[in-house]
Amino acid sequence: MEFLLKLEDLLRKRKEELPEKSYTAELFRDGVDRILKKIGEEAGEVIIAAKNPNEKELIHEIADLIFHLEVLMVEKGISLTTIAKELEKRHS
């Protein structure tokens, strides 16, 4: 789980610096509509992968979805800590 926090920091850095040859920076440059489109695509791929017996494929697709959700969170200024607190509040 610690890696997700490191990824969040890296994503913030990409958003600030917008390096030329970065897929993540490209997502930030293109804006929220592009990020949402990617989340939709990845969510669909998770659904399809979940119907198949290949666990490795499902893990790959879930990782892609989580990555793009984190990109959206950074774009919108929402931290993983905020999400964790919301989940904790719901399940405590």
Swiss-Prot record:
Highest taxon, organism lineage: Bacteria
What are the record keywords, sorted?
A: Amino-acid biosynthesis, ATP-binding, Cytoplasm, Histidine biosynthesis, Hydrolase, Nucleotide-binding
Gene Ontology cellular component?
A: cytoplasm
> Its Gene Ontology biological processes?
L-histidine biosynthetic process
As its record notes, the protein acts as a catalyst of: 1-(5-phospho-beta-D-ribosyl)-ATP + H2O = 1-(5-phospho-beta-D-ribosyl)-5'-AMP + diphosphate + H(+)
Give the signal peptide, or none: none
What GO annotations for molecular function exist for this entry? ATP binding; phosphoribosyl-ATP diphosphatase activity
The main place the protein resides is: cytoplasm
Biochemical pathway? Amino-acid biosynthesis; L-histidine biosynthesis; L-histidine from 5-phospho-alpha-D-ribose 1-diphosphate: step 2/9
**Where is the protein found, in the record's own terms?**
Cytoplasm
Taken from the record, one Pfam family name reads PRA-PH
**Entry EC number(s):** 3.6.1.31
Supply the SUPFAM superfamilies for this chain: all-alpha NTP pyrophosphatases
PANTHER family under this entry?
A: HISTIDINE BIOSYNTHESIS BIFUNCTIONAL PROTEIN, HISTIDINE BIOSYNTHESIS BIFUNCTIONAL PROTEIN HISIE
Q: Which family does it belong to?
A: Belongs to the PRA-PH family.
Q: What is this protein called?
A: Phosphoribosyl-ATP pyrophosphatase
